[in-house]
Regions:
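Signature of uroporphyrinogen-III synthase
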Residues: 1-262
């Protein structure tokens, strides 16, 4: 293996959404690999955004604003800026907590610094970090996607806090490259398939479930980010070979390289 290009000769399926795919592909190329981008998900605003605008106008009622993804930050602040243009008063920002380094980086780019970023990049880790602040009557606003897990809302509510789930974006399966994906798998042109969320796993399976995908991928390494993504794959009998302890694409790529070296 070339130490400067450890992924040389490997074709890696990048299933990230279109806006996030380029950065991951760039890292694959830098390591000598060949990325193929087939986005399995797309993200869009909810059809009815009235409740989002009203909630943002009343942001002062919340002690905490919680983001669990980069998309949550991007969509929330798009709405926030739109509301600011229409109101004369300033809208104070609550204390902010986030999950994940990418979410934190996106928030910092908007000009805001989170009070809490847990070491563990999952909802359970965030709840443990928030626990000292969770008291009866304390109000938390969670700006998230429609497919987000209910864990945080459930735990906050269970401990007496008032948790409001604000859906600022919707995750939709993307099947536009379905035939291309099936052809690549059938012709065994893919060496490694990556998943970055449970939703990407489910959409992949939805596309291939009526095919002979198991035979077509018997040589493929499946790699994913996070225990929830692995759980979704296990449920659908997709064999995960690589799942890093840190839930970022950088660590995912490092683990793929380490696996190939072994």
């Amino acid at each position: 293996m070339d130490s400067t290009q450890p992924l040389l000769g490997k074709t890696i399926l990048n299933t990230r959404g279109k806006s996030a795919a380029a950065a991951f592909s760039k890292k694959i190329l830098a390591a000598g690999g060949t990325p193929i981008e087939i986005p399995l998900l797309t993200f869009q605003k909810p059809k009815d955004t009235t409740i989002i605008a009203e909630t943002i106008k009343n942001l002062h009622r919340y002690e905490w604003l919680v983001f669990t993804s980069k998309n949550g930050v991007d969509f929330f602040f798009e709405f926030y800026d739109q509301v600011l243009e229409k109101v004369t008063k300033n809208i104070p920002m609550p204390k902010i907590a986030v999950v994940g380094s990418k979410t934190e980086k996106t928030l910092l780019a908007k000009g805001y610094r989170p009070v809490l970023v847990p070491d563990e990049f999952i909802a359970e880790g965030l709840f443990e970090s928030l626990r000292p602040y969770v008291m009866p009557g304390v109000r938390f606003l969670l700006a998230r996607g429609n497919l987000s897990r209910s864990f945080l809302v459930d735990e906050l509510t269970k401990h007496g806090a008032v948790a409001t789930d604000l859906i600022v974006y919707e995750t939709v399966g993307d099947s536009r490259d379905k035939e291309h994906l099936i052809t690549l798998l059938k012709e065994k042109q893919i060496d490694i398939i990556t998943f970055t969320s449970p939703s990407t796993v489910k959409q992949f399976y939805k596309i291939v479930e009526q095919t002979e995908w198991e035979e077509w991928t018997n040589h493929v390494l499946f790699a994913c980010i996070g225990p929830e993504t692995k759980k979704a794959a296990d449920h659908l009998h997709i064999p995960i070979h690589i799942c890093p302890k840190n839930y970022t694409t950088d660590h995912l790529l490092d683990e793929i390289i380490n696996y190939l070296k072994a």
